[in-house]
Amino acid sequence: MERHRARALGRDSKSSRRKGLQSAPPAGPYEPGEKRPKLHLNIRTLTDDMLDKFASIRIPGSKKERPPLPHLKTVSGISDSSSLSSETMENNPKALPESEVLKLFEKMMEDMNLNEDKKAPLREKDFGIKKEMVMQYINTASKTGSLRSSRQISPQEFLHELKMGYTDERLFTYLESLRVSLTSHPVSWVQSFGHEGLGLLLDILEKLINGQIQEKVVKKTQHKVIQCLRALMNTQYGLERIMSDKRSLSLLAKAMDPRQPAMMADVVKLLSAVCIVGEESILEEVLEALTSAGEERKIDRFFSIVEGLRHNSVNLQVACMQLINALVTSPDDLDFRLHLRNEFMRCGLKEILPNLKGIKNDGLDIQLKVFDEHKEEDLSEFFHRLEDIRAELDEASDVYSMLWDTVKETRAEGHFLSILQHLLLIRNDRFIREQYFKLIDECVSQIVLHRDGTDPDFTYRKRLDLDLSQFVDVCIDQAKLDEWEEKASEHCKKFEKECTDHQETQAQLQKREAKINELQAELQAFKSQFGALPPGTKIPLQPSVEGEAGPSALPPAPPALSGGVPPPPPPPPPPPPPLPGMPMPFGGPVPPPPPLGFLGGQSSIPLNLPFGLKPKKEFKPEISMRRLNWLKIGPNEMSENCFWIKVNENKYENRDLLCKLENTFCCQEKEKRNTNDFDEKKVIKKRMKELKFLDPKIAQNLSIFLSSFRVPYEKIRTMILEVDETQLSESMIQNLIKHLPDEEQLKSLSQFRSDYNSLCEPEQFAVVMSNVKRLRPRLSAILFKLQFEEQVNNIKPDIMAVSTACEEIKKSKGFSKLLELVLLMGNYMNAGSRNAQTFGFDLSSLCKLKDTKSADQKTTLLHFLVDVCEEKHADILHFVDDLAHLDKASRVSVEMLEKNVKQMGRQLQQLEKNLETFPPPEDLHDKFVIKMSSFVISANEQYEKLSTLLGSMTQLYQSIMGYYAVDMKKVSVEEFFNDLNNFRTSFMLALKENIKKREAAEKEKRARIAKERAEKERLERQQEKKRLLEMKTEGDETGVMDSLLEALQSGAAFRDRRKRTPKLKDIRQSLSPMSQRPVLKVCNHENQKMQLTEGSRPHHSINCNSTRTPVAKELNYNLDTHASTGRIKAVEKEACNAESNKKKEMELLGSVAKSESVPEVEALLARLRAL
C-alpha cells in the first residue's frame, strides 16, 4: 500500500509541475531585426544528461497527448530536470568546448532523424555554423518547454512495467500508453526502448497466444501488442529489428485469427509490408512462419488467409488480398510464383474470387486487379518459355540431357528411369509405336499442363480424364494412310519400270542409229571406190562376218569418212600447234621468271587462246590471303563443249563479297601447319592355305552336306536332271559344286555300284551322282540360271543410278552457278600465285574448301560459301536436291558393273556351247537341254538390254567428265562421283552447322539479354525496396510503415515485371501519401517536380538565415501524430504554391507562423532538414 501511495504522490507532483509549465506563457516569435536574448546555460553541466535531453525533444501539440499511466515508479531524474534546465539557461553557451559542441551536433542530427546521406554534407560544414545550429536548437527547445517535459516517462520505466508480468487491464493500459509514446517520441527514444523492449513485447504476445484464453481482455491486449509492434515498425530501426527476428514473424503468423478481424487485419498488413520490403530470405522466413503456424493448427498454411477473405469485414478482405499479392509477386522465380498462386487456388481462393469481384470497394478492386494482372503476366511468361524450349530444344539428346540433369541424384531419378524402361516395352512396330507415343504425349500434357491454371487433383476421382476421340481419329487416318502408301509404292515400282524401259529403248535406238550410220558409211565408201552399179545387177550375199571385215581393209575409207560422219573423238583443232609455247605466257607476268622477257605478252594471249577464251581478270587484293589449293585445268585440256568454256563468274563479282572474303581469309597471322606424317597402310592379304582334298576329308564334307538336307539321294539326282527350280536352291548347288569329288573319283566310285549297301553314306551319294553325265557343267549352268535374275536386278538399278546422276549433274543450274562462284572466289584468293587467273578447276578441289581455314580459325571457306549462298544466291542451294541420285551413284563401282556384264556374256556363250555339245538324254527325267535352251533365249534378250544400258551409261559419264574437263586417265568414274557426293554431303553439313551456329548465337544473345535484364531488375528491385524504406523526400526515418501500407493499398508496391520499371519520380509520386489525396492531385503533380529538382541538387554552402518549406513533414497524414486538419490544409496549400526563391520561402514561413501559430521549432526543424 505504501508503494502505491508513493506512486500516487509522484503522479500528483508530476501533474502539478506539468500544469505549472503549461501555464507559463509561450515565447512568441521575434522580428527579423530584433535582438534575441542570450541563453543562460551552464556549460559544465551539458554532458551526457544534456545529450539525452536532445534525444527526447518533441514538438508540443503535434502529437496526441498520452493517457495517464498508472502505477509507475517515480524517478529521481524527473526532479532534477527543472533545476538542470534553469541552471543551463543561466550560463553562456558560447563557452562550450568544441568536443561538446560536436557531441551535441551529432545528437541533434540523430534526433532530427537524418540518415547518413543527409549527415555527411552537414559534418563538412564550418565549426561556427555547427555551433550556431546547436545554439538555435537549444534555444528553441528551451523556449517551448520541451526540455522540461521530455523526461516524464522514460523507456526504462516502460521496460520496468513490462517486466512485471501483468495480464489484466493494467497491461492493456500500459500498452496503450506505450503505443502513443512510440508514435510521438523521436527515433532515439524508440531505439532506446526497442533494444530490450522488442523482446519483452514478443514475450507478452507469445504468452497471450499460447495461453489459449478466449477472454475479451486477453484478445484486446493481444491486439494492443500488435499495435505497439506496428508503431515500432513505423521507424526504419524498428522495421529492421523485427525483420531480423525470426520469432517476431512466427508470432505474427500465429496471431492471424479470422474470428478477430480487426487484429488480423493489422497482422496481415504488417506481414505484407515485410514481404515487399525484405529480400528473398525474408520471404522464405514469412512462408516458413506460415507453414509452422499451419502445421501447429493442423491446417493448410494459407487457410487462415483464405478464411479472412470469407469474412464480412471488407477491411480484412483488402488486407488479406494485399498479403496474397505480396507473397505471389515477390519471388523472382516464375515457377515459385506459379506454385504459390496455385496453392492459394487449391485452398479455396478460386471459389472466393467471383464473390470478391462482386463487392463494390475501391481498395479491394485495386488488389483484385493486381492479382489478375500478375497472373496473366506469369502465364504469358510461362507460355513464352515453353515456346522457347520447343524452338531451341529440337534435338532429343539435348532434351534428355536437360531432363537427366534435372532428376539425377534426386528422388525423382528412380521414377524417371522407370518411365524410360516402360517406354522400351512398346511393341516394335513403326505404326503402333507412333500411336503409343501419341497417347502417352496426350496423358503427360494433361498432367503437367492443366487448362485452368491449377495443379490437377487426381485424388478426388482416382483417375485421369483422357480424351481419346482424337486418338481414334488418328488411328482411322493411319489406316487410310497405310492404304495410300501401298498404292503409292505400287505406282513407284511402275514408274521405275517405265524409266528402265525408257532407257532401254533409248539405248537400243542409239545402237540401231549407230548401226545405220555405219552401214551408210560403208555404202558411201563402196560407191566412191567402185562406182554405182548398173540397174538390175544382182550382188551375191556374203557371210556377215566377212562383210563386217570389209571396210577395215580399205585404206582410203577413214579419210573419206572424216568429212561426212562425225567420229566419236573430235579431230584435233587448228590452234594446238602454237600452244606448246603458251603455257608460261598464259599466266602472264604472275610467275617469278617472266616468260620470254617481254612486257606485252599479256596482250597477245587473247589471239592464241582456243575456243574464244578470254584471259581472266587479274585481282590484286590489298592484303595477302590464304590460298585455295585447287587443281588447275589449262585451256589445252578443254574441249569445245566444255563447261569451263561457257562460265561467266564475273556476274557474281561484288565488292562487298570480296571485302568480306579478304577479312575472313587474310594471312595476317602465320598459319600453323601441322605436318602429319601419314604412313601408308600396307594391305596384308591373307593367304589362304591350299587344302588337299583327301578321301576322308571329302567324305566328311559330304556327310555334313547330306545331314543338312535330309533328302534321298535318288531324289536329289532327279531334281538335278529335271532342273527343278522349286526344290533346288542356290546354296544347295553351291555346296554340291564345292564338295563333290572330281570326275575321275566319281568314275572310280561307279565301279562299286554292286557293293552299294556296304558303302558309307558319302560314298553311296557319290555312286548315285556318278550316273549323271557331265555333272559339274550341269550344276554350273543350273547355278547360273538361278542367279541370273538376281544379277540382272542388281545391275540394272546401279546403271540407272549412274545414268540419272550424270543427267542431273549436267542439267543442274544451281551446281553450275556454284562452280562459277567458287571460281571467282578462288581466283581472288589466289591472286599473285601460280593458280591465279584460272579458267577452270578440277571438281575434286571442291572437297578442299573445308580445309581452307579463316584467319581466326573459326570458320572455313566452305562455311563462308554456304553463308554467301544463303544471303544472296538462295537458288544455288537447290543443287543439293537436284543431285538426288548422286549418293547412290557414288556407291556404284562402274568397273565392277562392266566386269559383271562381261562375265554374264561369257557364261551365256559357254552355256550355248555346252548345249551344242551336250549328249542326248538317256534318262526320261533329264530335261536339262530343253529348259536351258529356252533360258538361253530369254537370257540373251536380258543381256542385250543390259549391254545397251551399260553402253548408254558409259557414254553419259564420259560425256559429263569431258564436260567438266576431267581426265579419265587420272580420275576414275568412282572417284568422280565420290568427290561430288562428299562435297554435297559436306555442303549440307555446313549448311546445318551454320544454322545451328546462328541459333546458338541467337540463344546466347537471348540468354545474355535475359541475364542483363534479370540483373537490371534485381538492382531496380533493390532500389525500389530502398525507396520504400526511404519514402520521405527529405529522408525521414519515421512513418515507414505508414508509407508501406499506403503503397500496398494503392497497389504501387507490387512491381510490374513486363512493363518498364518506373523512374524515381514516378515511384515517389505513386508512393507519396499526398498523391493519394484527391484535393491535392493537381498541385502536387507540379510541386513534386520542384521538390525532386531541389532535393537532387548538391549543396555546397549553407545559409543559416534561409529556411526551406517542410513539405514532406507537413504532408504526412497520420491522424494520431498530426495537428488539426485546417492547419494541414493551409500548409499544403502554401506548399503547393511555394517558390525556390529564398525571399518567398521566408515570406511563406512567416505567413504560416503568423496565421497558424506554428512554433519556431518547426521552422528550425524544416530549415535543418533542408540543409
Curated annotation (Swiss-Prot):
Modified residues (Phosphothreonine): T47
Comp. bias (Low complexity): 76-86
Residues covered by region (Disordered): 1-40, 60-95, 532-601
Residue ranges occupied by any DAD domain in the UniProt entry: 1036-1066
Pro residues: bias regions: 553-596
Motif, Nuclear localization signal: chain positions: 16-39
Domain FH1, chain residue ranges per copy: 540-610
InterPro entries: ARM-like, ARM-type_fold, DAD_dom, DIA_GBD_sf, Drf_DAD, FH2_Formin, FH2_Formin_sf, FH3_dom
Cellular component aspect of the GO annotation: actin filament bundle; cleavage furrow; cytoplasm; ESCRT I complex; filamentous actin; microtubule organizing center; nucleus; ribbon synapse
MF terms (GO), sorted A to Z: actin binding; cytoskeletal protein binding; microtubule binding; protein homodimerization activity; small GTPase binding
Gene Ontology annotations of biological process type: actin crosslink formation; actin cytoskeleton organization; actin filament bundle assembly; actin filament organization; actin filament polymerization; actin nucleation; autophagosome-lysosome fusion; cell projection organization
Residue ranges constituting the GBD/FH3 domain according to the UniProt record: 93-455
PTM description: Ubiquitinated.
Keyword set includes Repeat: yes
Keywords per UniProt: Coiled coil, Cytoplasm, Nucleus, Phosphoprotein, Repeat, Ubl conjugation
Domain of life: Eukaryota
Biased amino acid composition, Basic and acidic residues: 1-15
Domain FH2 per the UniProt entry, residue ranges: 615-1013
Effect of K494R: No loss of ubiquitination
Coiled-coil residue windows: 373-403, 478-533, 887-918, 988-1038
Domain remark from Swiss-Prot or TrEMBL: The DAD domain regulates activation via by an autoinhibitory interaction with the GBD/FH3 domain. This autoinhibition is released upon competitive binding of an activated GTPase. The release of DAD allows the FH2 domain to then nucleate and elongate nonbranched actin filaments.
Purpose of the protein: Actin nucleation and elongation factor required for the assembly of F-actin structures, such as actin cables and stress fibers. Required for cytokinesis, stress fiber formation and transcriptional activation of the serum response factor. Binds to GTP-bound form of Rho and to profilin: acts in a Rho-dependent manner to recruit profilin to the membrane, where it promotes actin polymerization. DFR proteins couple Rho and Src tyrosine kinase during signaling and the regulation of actin dynamics.
Protein family membership: Belongs to the formin homology family. Diaphanous subfamily.
Protein name per the record: Protein diaphanous homolog 3
